[in-house]
């Protein structure tokens, strides 16, 4: 059987959120991130909300809310997201309360996401980080369904900060089988090679969150 052809470098770049969420990041680091993102031709840059506003002509600016633990009060997440959008963020990646999901408290997860959705209305894309590596398959499916009901635009695997790990092909495939075609699927956390990125895209990821974008893109054909 013939191997599936790899997507081109440009095709992959168009799906990348070039990300800098390190707590020690400086304004100069963000400026360097933006410059590299423009050189690479990626879709977006993703930075911490405290680094906004970011001047990034030609790029989408994304940020996070309730990051990385998800243990913030829903109203705090909503306020953080709303302020970020006021400061120019076009996309917000919020973290759910993973403990609530692990406990099967899906009504609490729903309320959390709805609060953020209502806070930003339709002014920005809302991605919901579920920390898939910390959840059972059943919980992944249920949280994806909850995110869809709450009005999210994407579900996202991971913050990249959770000790359970980051994106996996299994989780992405499960997420895509549950809400793919209706919601975007963002894989993030521990994606450092072109091979890993290609596997996640083949499994159904429609967006990639990467901090090592240049190294990953170097593995794709022009």
UniProtKB/Swiss-Prot annotation:
SMART domains: DeoC. It catalyses: 2-deoxy-D-ribose 5-phosphate = D-glyceraldehyde 3-phosphate + acetaldehyde. GO terms for cellular component: cytoplasm. The active site is at 93 (proton donor/acceptor), 156 (schiff-base intermediate with acetaldehyde), 186 (proton donor/acceptor). Pathway: Carbohydrate degradation; 2-deoxy-D-ribose 1-phosphate degradation; D-glyceraldehyde 3-phosphate and acetaldehyde from 2-deoxy-alpha-D-ribose 1-phosphate: step 2/2. Its EC number is 4.1.2.4. Keywords: Cytoplasm, Lyase, Schiff base. It comes from Nocardia farcinica (strain IFM 10152). One of its GO terms (molecular function) is deoxyribose-phosphate aldolase activity. Pfam families: DeoC. SUPFAM superfamilies: Aldolase. It is found in: Cytoplasm. CDD domains: DeoC. Belongs to the DeoC/FbaB aldolase family. DeoC type 1 subfamily. GO terms for biological process: 2-deoxyribose 1-phosphate catabolic process; carbohydrate catabolic process; deoxyribonucleotide catabolic process. This is Deoxyribose-phosphate aldolase. Catalyzes a reversible aldol reaction between acetaldehyde and D-glyceraldehyde 3-phosphate to generate 2-deoxy-D-ribose 5-phosphate. It comes from the Bacteria.
């Amino acid at each position: 059987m013939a191997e599936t052809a790899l997507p081109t470098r440009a095709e992959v770049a168009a799906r990348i959120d070039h990300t800098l969420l390190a707590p020690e990041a400086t304004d100069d680091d963000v400026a360097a991130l933006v410059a590299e993102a423009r050189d690479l031709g990626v879709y977006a840059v993703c930075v911490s909300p405290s680094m906004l506003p970011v001047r990034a002509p030609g790029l989408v600016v994304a940020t996070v809310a309730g990051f990385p633990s998800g243990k913030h009060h829903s109203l705090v997440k909503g306020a953080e997201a709303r302020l970020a959008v006021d400061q120019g963020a076009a996309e917000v990646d919020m973290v759910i309360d993973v403990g609530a999901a692990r406990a099967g408290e899906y009504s609490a997860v729903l309320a959390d996401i709805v609060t953020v959705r209502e806070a930003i209305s339709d002014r920005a894309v809302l991605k919901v980080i579920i920390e898939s590596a910390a959840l059972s398959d059943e919980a992944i499916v249920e949280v994806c369904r909850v995110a869809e009901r709450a009005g999210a635009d994407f579900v996202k695997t991971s913050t990249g900060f959770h000790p359970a790990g980051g994106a996996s092909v299994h989780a992405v495939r499960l997420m895509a089988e549950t809400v793919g075609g209706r919601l975007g699927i963002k894989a993030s956390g521990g994606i450092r090679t072109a091979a890993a990125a290609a596997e996640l895209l083949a499994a159904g990821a429609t967006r990639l969150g990467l901090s090592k974008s240049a190294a990953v893109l170097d593995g794709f054909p022009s």
